[in-house]
Amino acid sequence: MEGSLMTEAQSKIRISVRNLVEFVLRSGDLDNRRSQGGKKEAMQAGSRLHRKIQKRMGADYRSEVALKHQVREDEFSILLEGRADGIITETSGIVIDEIKCIYMDVERLEEPDPVHLAQALCYGYMYASEQDLDSVGIQLTYCNIETEQIRRFRQAKTREELEEWFQGLIHEYVKWARYLYHHSI
């Protein structure tokens, strides 16, 4: 860009899907950790349960699918990276599964946590774009760490809906990136 002081290296941002959605959307926290002291144990228990759920899902379930997506807005080139917990191939189409292990009673959940849903929507957009799909299913799988009780929330999204939502998310993130870049010393 003529007149821009920004170099190509300075304009590149690499961020995980989780960090992006947490930064833009975080306003509260679903009670998935009882205390800071038990955080390591809770994370280990959650990881074990996560793998157990994935193994139960069968042959049509691909676990830990790495995804990358490059997007450019204004002077920024953003590389978004992450791993979809699962991609399910069904006769009706593809479903992106995001698994969250929590201490909360899953029956008390009325809807997915907005940050968790945003993470799944990002993966849905990234996968639909990469595979040139018209639509995908978005599934949030919540599992109680102590009881192993599962509750799922599912919705269908067109690629157009996902793209519109994703562009809004990136636009909000770029507002911050632009401010930080232009106001840093």
List each language-model region with its residue ranges:
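A helicase ATPase "motif cassette" and its flanking acidic/Ser/Thr-rich regulatory loops
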Residues: 14-17, 167, 182-184
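Metal-dependent nuclease catalytic cores that hydrolyze phosphodiester bonds in DNA/RNA
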Residues: 1-92
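Histidine (H) residue identity feature
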Residues: 50, 69, 116, 171, ...
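Mg2+/Mn2+-dependent nuclease catalytic core
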Residues: 71-166
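Pre-P-loop entry segment of helicase/translocase ATPase cores
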Residues: 175-185
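Secondary-structure transition/capping residues
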Residues: 60, 64, 134-135, 177
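Hydrophobic residues within well-ordered, non-membrane alpha-helices that form the packing/core
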Residues: 53-57, 127, 170
